[in-house]
Amino acid sequence: ATYKVKLVTPEGEVELEVPDDVYILDQAEEEGIDLPYSCRAGSCSSCAGKLVSGEIDQSDQSFLDDDQMEEGWVLTCAAYPKSDVVIETHKEEELTA
């Protein structure tokens, strides 16, 4: 399945179609959208975003704890969409504050 992923970035909103077996960060890059990242392995906070609505699968990530995930934190480099989603990007400073 392919889902609509809306990214709310500091530069504005952007919408892309992301298959459910492709990481959101990877698809964004393919479409020329510049998102922050570092490790690309789900083990740091560089790519962190906040899930506004929808459902993702980020079981590959190892950085966020259960409480953070319940609060809606998402690592875009290790997140697959499981429904149409809206994510606020560029949130690392807020997460690590």
From Swiss-Prot:
Keywords: 2Fe-2S, Chloroplast, Electron transport, Iron, Iron-sulfur, Metal-binding, Plastid, Transport. Residues 3-93 form the 2Fe-2S ferredoxin-type domain. Gene3D superfamilies: 3.10.20.30. It is found in: Plastid, Chloroplast. One of its GO terms (cellular component) is chloroplast stroma. One of its GO terms (molecular function) is 2 iron, 2 sulfur cluster binding. Its cofactor is [2Fe-2S] cluster. Belongs to the 2Fe2S plant-type ferredoxin family. Ferredoxins are iron-sulfur proteins that transfer electrons in a wide variety of metabolic reactions. This is Ferredoxin. It comes from Hordeum vulgare. The lineage of its organism: Eukaryota, Viridiplantae, Streptophyta, Embryophyta, Tracheophyta.
